[in-house]
Amino acid sequence: MLKKTTWIKLPRNVLVGHDVIGDLAAAIEELYLDGRPLIVTSPTPDQLIGNRVRSQFADPQTVSVDHASFDAVEAVIDTAKATDAGYLIGLGGGKPIDTAKMASDRLGCGFVSVPTAASHDGIVSGRSSIPEGDTRHSVAADPPLAVVADTAVLAEAPWELTTAGCADIISNYTAVKDWQLAHRLQDVEYSEYAGALSQMTAEMLVDNSDAIKQGFEESAWLVAKALVSSGVAMSIAGSSRPASGAEHLISHQLDRLVPDAALHGHQVGVASIVTAYLHTGENGEWEDIRAALADVGAPTTATELGIDEEIFIQAITSAHAIRDRHTILGNGVSEAAAREAAVFTDVC
């Protein structure tokens, strides 16, 4: 007798395109959210389009966060209660969006994502990444009820943020392989639909990497659509598995060893070159991944990340201990094997 159940939580409204920031209020109106919004942002995005957002609502409140942290989450919760906010709008990059997402989950209220940079798939997913000391916590939360991604705004963001978003998506290649490996070896539940969607999203960026250029709004359109698809894949799976495997473990270990050395997306992109080699060997997909990263202008080596090569190799050998998630790293990669993979792929 079948006893399986699944509960998939997805955004109800997703707007991506030119000047859609002006449709934010209309997108929220369809959600029938009560009360006034609390806009969670940071100084730069607030200066950029904060007034365009506030002008669409009656008596909106704003709170600015400088860093994503558990203290920032508590501050947003306190402000939301003090201002009697009915729902939260995360306006900006990863810091305000992750903070608002986690705060809304704690408050039990609605959350709307308004990214100003296409830097990572957290703009759509049901995961918040919150640092604490030398550790970065991936915290489960509900995905946003709506996502409004204005490609004109995204195209004006620093290009390195867009290339980080590209690299984050391209790394889905190896995340899906790790998920499939865990399914075969440890009977981890695998969703064919979520896996296929994540894989297709990575392939879309790899196949179009030479068309993603700085200063073109069409590039922001391609990356934003890919980030939405990746976030939806995670919502379907009910976990971060479609977009997070060994490459993310290596990135998290780098965060511990050399905090704030490079952008998250860039770190997982470079790490995925190595993990693809570990999966498929000398003539595998690592070359396609490396070429696509180079096409968009993302780093492809430890040196380009600003990270010492020996530290990068150390991260490969110790990343398996970050969390209990089976990947190609298994119970640990030897230093010799890590060095061979990193040197053969020109990462080190």
Curated annotation (Swiss-Prot):
One of its GO terms (molecular function) is metal ion binding. InterPro entries: G1P_dehydrogenase_arc, G1PDH, Glycerol_DH. Substrate binds at D121, D168, H252. Pathway: Membrane lipid metabolism; glycerophospholipid metabolism. It is found in: Cytoplasm. Zn(2+) binds at D168, H248, H264. Binds 1 zinc ion per subunit. Catalyzes the NAD(P)H-dependent reduction of dihydroxyacetonephosphate (DHAP or glycerone phosphate) to glycerol 1-phosphate (G1P). The G1P thus generated is used as the glycerophosphate backbone of phospholipids in the cellular membranes of Archaea. This is Glycerol-1-phosphate dehydrogenase [NAD(P)+]. It comes from Haloquadratum walsbyi (strain DSM 16790 / HBSQ001). The lineage of its organism: Archaea, Methanobacteriati, Methanobacteriota, Stenosarchaea group, Halobacteria. The gene is egsA.
